């Protein structure tokens, strides 16, 4: 049976990088693509950034590939993650030969809790002077992330780091840390605890101290973006939002309105997200081919302006397709 992939270009450069990734997927497999819409322009036209039809398509598809959203990002990506019941956001941050990186030895994977924390939407404006935010952390969600992390590092004998701020947020981050460490201990997986602010310093000084980092929602968002600065920028970071029966894949970068429409957006992060999608659908050989092609182009060129080159999105995509 042909697998169904929903593609949502979204706003800004999403409309430029998603077609590039679709061309790559077509080059390595036989998929049925269903295009859906979401984002700022959809809200202007219909009054809602994420139509129910798009939400339903993502919930029912074998996998979904999303580009970017602008001002309506929170109204689009958070519900889409809910649609696939995504409990973990997987964010690799890797430096590639040929790319000018602050820390070329960087090779990290962030496993970020994806349903709770300060992104769970419980904000209130109580007066002209006071707004509040409720942070939600449950043992069950923390354990589910930890179980995934144990599987990710190969189970017994593996290891990962737990980044938290339990010395200050004792109840919430304390609960997260305790749950993650307890699951790892039960599975025979070694853990190292690191305070998230200390991690930010240490990873800049020597990223080889770390490999797989398990974090609460906000910390994972911030720390993985920091890691992007070590490897050459957000244009290189893919991500996967994994649920029990569905998944959503997206580049970490945003809609980049400053360059949207110029045809110079770096498609690497989106194409690498497509490689993660292939892994998820058990097409590991094809995923490896895609990653190899991207790495070859990053090493030898052509490169988009964000990486010091003058190539267009189409030029880079064509070079990747040639290698496939």
Curated annotation (Swiss-Prot):
It is found in: Cytoplasm. Its EC number is 1.1.1.85. Disruption phenotype: Auxotrophic for leucine. Its cofactor is Mg(2+); Mn(2+). GO terms for cellular component: cytoplasm. Mg(2+) binds at residues 197, 221, 225. One of its GO terms (biological process) is L-leucine biosynthetic process. Substrate binds at residues 81, 91, 112, 197. Its main location: cytoplasm. It catalyses: (2R,3S)-3-isopropylmalate + NAD(+) = 4-methyl-2-oxopentanoate + CO2 + NADH. Disulfide bonds: none annotated. Gene3D superfamilies: Isopropylmalate Dehydrogenase. The record marks 119, 165 as: Important for catalysis. One of its GO terms (molecular function) is 3-isopropylmalate dehydrogenase activity. Belongs to the isocitrate and isopropylmalate dehydrogenases family. Catalyzes the oxidation of 3-carboxy-2-hydroxy-4-methylpentanoate (3-isopropylmalate) to 3-carboxy-4-methyl-2-oxopentanoate. The product decarboxylates to 4-methyl-2 oxopentanoate. This is 3-isopropylmalate dehydrogenase.
């Amino acid at each position: 049976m042909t697998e169904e992939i929903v593609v949502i270009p979204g706003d800004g450069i999403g409309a430029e990088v998603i077609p590039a990734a679709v061309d790559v997927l077509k080059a390595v497999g036989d998929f049925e693509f269903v295009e859906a819409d979401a984002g700022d322009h959809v809200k202007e036209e219909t009054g809602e950034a994420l139509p129910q039809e798009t939400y339903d398509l993502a919930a029912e598809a074998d996998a979904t590939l999303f580009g970017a959203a602008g001002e309506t990002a929170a109204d689009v990506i958070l519900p889409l993650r809910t649609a696939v019941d995504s409990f973990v956001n997987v964010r690799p941050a890797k430096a590639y030969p040929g790319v000018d990186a602050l820390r070329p030895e960087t090779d990290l994977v962030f496993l970020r809790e994806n349903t709770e924390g300060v992104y769970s939407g419980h904000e209130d404006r109580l007066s002209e002077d006071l707004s509040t935010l409720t942070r939600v952390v449950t043992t069950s969600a923390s354990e589910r992330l930890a179980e995934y992390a144990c599987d990710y590092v190969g189970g017994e004998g593996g290891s990962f780091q737990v980044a938290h701020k339990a010395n200050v947020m004792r109840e919430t981050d304390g609960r997260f840390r305790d749950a993650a460490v307890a699951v790892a201990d039960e599975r025979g997986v070694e853990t190292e605890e690191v305070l998230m602010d200390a991690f930010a310093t240490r990873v800049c000084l020597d990223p080889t101290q770390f490999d797989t980092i398990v974090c609460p929602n906000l910390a994972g968002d911030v720390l993985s973006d920091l890691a992007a600065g070590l490897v050459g920028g957000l244009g290189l970071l893919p991500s996967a939002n994994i649920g029990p029966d569905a998944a959503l894949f997206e580049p970490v970068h945003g809609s980049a309105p400053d360059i949207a429409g110029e045809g110079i957006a770096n498609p690497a992060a989106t194409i690498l997200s497509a490689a993660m999608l292939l892994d998820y659908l058990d097409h590991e050989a094809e995923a490896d081919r895609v990653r190899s092609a991207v790495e070859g182009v990053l090493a030898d060129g052509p490169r988009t302006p964000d990486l010091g080159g003058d190539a267009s999105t189409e030029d880079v995509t064509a070079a990747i397709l040639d290698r496939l």
